[in-house]
Swiss-Prot record:
Name of the protein in its database record: Fructokinase-1
Gene: FRK1
PROSITE patterns, sorted: PFKB_KINASES_1, PFKB_KINASES_2
One GO BP: starch biosynthetic process
InterPro entries (alphabetical): Carboh/pur_kinase_PfkB_CS, PfkB_Carbo_kinase, PfkB_dom, Ribo/fructo_kinase, Ribokinase-like
Gene3D superfamilies assigned to the protein according to its UniProt record, in alphabetical order: 3.40.1190.20
Pfam families: PfkB
Position of the signal peptide: none
Activity control, per UniProt: Inhibited at high fructose.
């Protein structure tokens, strides 16, 4: 990671989540919906900024009311939107989210195609990407061309400029043509990443084994990686670095909505790594950073919606002190 740079650049989709006003009902039974800005890479960028870090977003939005609203939300939250482009021929993506009684989610997407899928390599803000200390992305941008090619090119540009590459696959099975295609494409860029974060569900999906034991996790380890993380919801997180591995417990909170918790975790961790890259080699520092990220994720589950519930540094430190 190049010295003196503290910018996290997030690449991918930003969309509108429609969340039912009542938890525990199907989409058809929901009496009404609240619109909430979402999209994992955008959530990560805002999480970084909310914590006082430098963040930018690269992606495509529809040249429509929702797209303009989302760009304004990035700016209002201190995220550099110099990498955002608009498409007059496609709409901003929508997702209808079912909140089960336990706060977990199910999704129904409207993308045929949506603007985020139509970003081309020529539309990339190369200078912005080159400034990244960390370049973060998911796998949804790998599903369709031309966005897939733009994604691969952006990774190349960032890597050549000295950025750490951070990958959260953020599996959304409903968006892929098949489970096999999802697995193949998600793993197609696995070897390039420096930092990878997966959930329990993604670990099972990618390995075919329903276990979080070390030998299963190590199937996803690559010698080129600096850090592999497995998030375990309210059970905390397991971490694997070149010279050490372990687990960090979570914080007990009253969960309302898990939307954005993983993104808050990633944003918090990346913000800490950018501030002190040596934490990737220093277990004590890394554990402190993961603890901070766990607290950030936990707070995010205590309110509805991702972006409104992303905490400030003061709120995170308050939870850590209370615990």
């Amino acid at each position: 990671m190049a010295a003196g740079r503290e910018l996290v650049v997030s690449f991918g989709e930003m969309l509108i989540d429609f969340v039912p006003t009542v938890a525990g009902v199907s989409l058809a039974e929901a009496p009404a919906f609240l619109k909430a800005p979402g999209g994992a890479p955008a959530n990560v960028a805002i999480a970084v900024s909310r914590l006082g870090g430098g963040a930018a977003f690269v992606g495509k939005l529809g040249d429509d009311e929702f797209g303009r609203m989302l760009a304004a939300i990035l700016r209002d939250n201190g995220v550099d939107d110099g990498g955002v482009v608009f498409d007059s021929g496609a709409r901003t993506a929508l997702a209808f989210v079912t909140l089960r009684a336990d706060g977990e989610r199910e999704f129904m997407f409207y993308r045929n195609p949506s603007a985020d899928m139509l970003l081309t390599a020529d539309e990339l803000n190369v200078e912005l990407i080159k400034r990244a200390a960390v370049f973060h992305y998911g796998s949804i941008s790998l599903i369709a061309e031309p966005c897939r090619t733009a994604h691969l090119r952006a990774m190349e540009i960032a890597k050549e400029a000295g950025a750490l590459l951070s990958y959260d696959p953020n599996l959304r099975e409903a968006l892929w043509p098949s489970r096999e295609e999802a697995r193949t494409q998600i793993l197609s860029i696995w070897d390039q990443a420096d930092i990878v974060k997966v959930s329990e569900v993604e670990l099972e999906f990618l390995t075919g084994i329903d276990s979080v034991e070390d030998d299963v996790v190590m199937k996803l380890w690559r010698p080129t990686m600096k850090l592999l993380l497995v998030t375990l919801g309210d059970q905390g997180c397991k971490y694997y670095a070149r010279d050490f591995h372990g687990a960090v417990p979570s914080f007990k909170v009253q969960q309302v909505d898990t939307t954005g918790a993983g993104d808050a975790f990633v944003g918090a961790l990346l913000q800490r790594i950018v501030k002190d890259p040596s934490s990737l080699q220093d277990e004590k520092k890394l554990v402190e950073s993961i603890k901070f990220a766990n607290a950030c994720g936990a707070i995010t589950t205590t309110k509805k919606g991702a972006i409104p519930s992303l905490p400030t540094e003061a709120e995170v430190l308050q939870l850590i002190e209370k615990a």
